[in-house]
Amino acid sequence: MTEFPKIIMILGAVLLIIGAVLHFVGKMPGDIFVKKGNVTFFFPVVTCIIISVVLSILLNLFGRMK
């Protein structure tokens, strides 16, 4: 039972860090943002590429550990 508070604190810290990183990631150069009148279109091209590369590297590293 003493491990549960530690897990909750670590999970909270991880979520806080992820939230801070994602706040800045969505505004990268290369992301498409078009606003005309009432219509707003946002497509995070560069953000998607960076997330894909990072996830590919992490999954590749975790796959090799087995």
UniProtKB/Swiss-Prot annotation:
Keywords from the named record: Cell membrane, Membrane, Transmembrane, Transmembrane helix
Disulphide bridges: none
Gene Ontology terms: cellular component: plasma membrane
Subcellular location: Cell membrane
Record field: transmembrane: 6-26, 39-59
Membrane topology term: Multi-pass membrane protein
Pfam families, sorted: DUF2905
Record PANTHER family: BSR5223 PROTEIN (PTHR36443:SF1)
Protein's recorded name: Uncharacterized membrane protein YrzS
Protein's organism: Bacillus subtilis (strain 168)
Gene of this entry: yrzS
